[in-house]
Amino acid sequence: MSDQVIIFDTTLRDGEQALSASLTVKEKLQIAYALERLGVDVIEAGFPVSSPGDFESVKTIAQHIKNSRICGLSRAVAKDIDAAAEALKVAEAFRIHTFISTSTVHVQDKLRRSYDDVVEMGVKAVKHARKYTDDVEFSCEDAGRTPIDNLCRMVEAAIDAGANTINIPDTVGYTVPGEFGGIVQTLFNRVPNIDKAIISVHCHDDLGMSVANSIAAVQAGARQVEGTINGIGERAGNCSLEEIAMILKTRSEYLGVHTNLKHDEIHRTSKLVSQLCNMPIQSNKAIVGANAFSHSSGIHQDGMLKNKNTYEIMTPESIGLKNQALNLTSRSGRAAVKSHMDEMGYKEDEYNLDTLYADFVKLADRKGQVFDYDLEALMHFANLRDEDDFYKLNYLSVQSGSVMATTSIKLLCGDEEKCEAAVGNGPVDALYQCIYKLTGYDIVLDKFDLTAKGEGEDGLGQADIIANYKGRKYHGTGLATDIIEASGQALLHVINSIHRADQIAEIKQKKVETV
């Protein structure tokens, strides 16, 4: 048996299901690039048949990612598999992941089929997927609650049909480590053709057991672990891949396995996912939380000063968290900014230095010192910015009292600059009234969040909104030292997305009319 554990990331598929609004194609591609840098073996980019947006995202990622295998999810249905194959065919290497429910409650109450029918459907799906690729993964949904005899039967049939990866999901996070490890061990003991496939596990965190269950499965012989960055996912989330990575690295002698991950990419990958998904990382989160390497107890601090090994089982540097000795100021040149980006591991083709430096100078003039985390935030937002944004904020002035606020803005609408002033219940409300008047969009805000992206009173603030327009949800984000400006950027992000969608719909309609 191989001692390498394959890392299968499903942040862009299972993880995204936890978000209030879908990520854009550009945001998903940024995350995919980060996962590729991290050394993830397989990236599950989406569920192509579920929507045109998901299909386009999977196709785009398949076109651009070269060093990770791209995977698309499908039900055990021919049209799903066909859609996945169509989206993935441009990839250097791809996998089709098909699944069907196998637990008694799912088979009887959801599928309303006999178990014989379910096995037949699974076999047909695997055989159909093999027409497109020799890399097929088959999942037994809700395997954790599936009678073991039925599970063994399904696994054997799927392998015979051509599946070379068999995934055993604890779909509702029901099992405990000894139990889940026992399920995997039983498969190895009872399925005669088990040596022809890699056993994978996909654990959810409803009882807080996802990481522990995954490790128990690895000890029982599983050689692929599925999960997400920061453990994001439906309900209580998924298995945290950064935790799996550092467990397998830190306890490699005991567990006897390894991964191909570049562990020093963990920190920035985690930050990127948190930022783009607008899901803050709790301070005490293992591996990537702000307090993960903090020591406040006097006894602990004394031990750390004498020998870090007294209380530190891994170093901040091992996940790419480095202390910054030199801060940047408005007097720092382009070379200094580039040097900091180089030290953080960013390549020149991952960002536009001219754009980044221009944004850096503006920020440095406002806050004095600029830190590495500021540069990262500026880079991520610059990468998301579209040059063809129709609406751009040129000027903002706020007057706020104890009761009401007045905001004046100048908004560039295409080539025309328009001015507006409004009174509102606070500066953000007044600003939004101005933008609504000038753009004419009737938008309903479902969610509004402000988070700090740096340290100190002059740190960057990020505004994230979820907006509803004509029944469709949009996610907008803005970044600035001024939270009012950041809030305006977030709303304009949404409105520009709506404007582009309207333009595309208009072009399509004209084509239909022409035909």
UniProtKB/Swiss-Prot annotation:
Cofactor: Mn(2+)
PROSITE patterns associated with the record: AIPM_HOMOCIT_SYNTH_1, AIPM_HOMOCIT_SYNTH_2, PYR_CT
Subcellular location as annotated: Cytoplasm
Region of interest called Regulatory domain, as start-end residue ranges on this chain: 392-515
Keywords: Amino-acid biosynthesis, Branched-chain amino acid biosynthesis, Cytoplasm, Leucine biosynthesis, Manganese, Metal-binding, Transferase
Any one biological process term the GO annotation gives: L-leucine biosynthetic process
Pfam families, per database record: HCS_D2, HMGL-like, LeuA_dimer
Involved pathway(s): Amino-acid biosynthesis; L-leucine biosynthesis; L-leucine from 3-methyl-2-oxobutanoate: step 1/4
Range of residues in the leader sequence: none
InterPro entries membership: 2-IPM_HCS-like, 2-isopropylmalate_synth_dimer, AIPM/Hcit_synth_CS, Aldolase_TIM, LeuA/HCS_post-cat, LeuA_allosteric_dom_sf, LeuA_bact_synth, PYR_CT
Domain Pyruvate carboxyltransferase: residue ranges: 5-267
E.C. numbers: 2.3.3.13
GO MF term (any one): acetyl-CoA C-acetyltransferase activity
Free-text function comment from the UniProt entry: Catalyzes the condensation of the acetyl group of acetyl-CoA with 3-methyl-2-oxobutanoate (2-ketoisovalerate) to form 3-carboxy-3-hydroxy-4-methylpentanoate (2-isopropylmalate).
Assembly with partners or alone: Homodimer.
Protein family per UniProt: Belongs to the alpha-IPM synthase/homocitrate synthase family. LeuA type 1 subfamily.
Protein name: 2-isopropylmalate synthase
Organism: Aliivibrio fischeri (strain ATCC 700601 / ES114) (Vibrio fischeri)
Source lineage: Bacteria, Pseudomonadati, Pseudomonadota, Gammaproteobacteria, Vibrionales
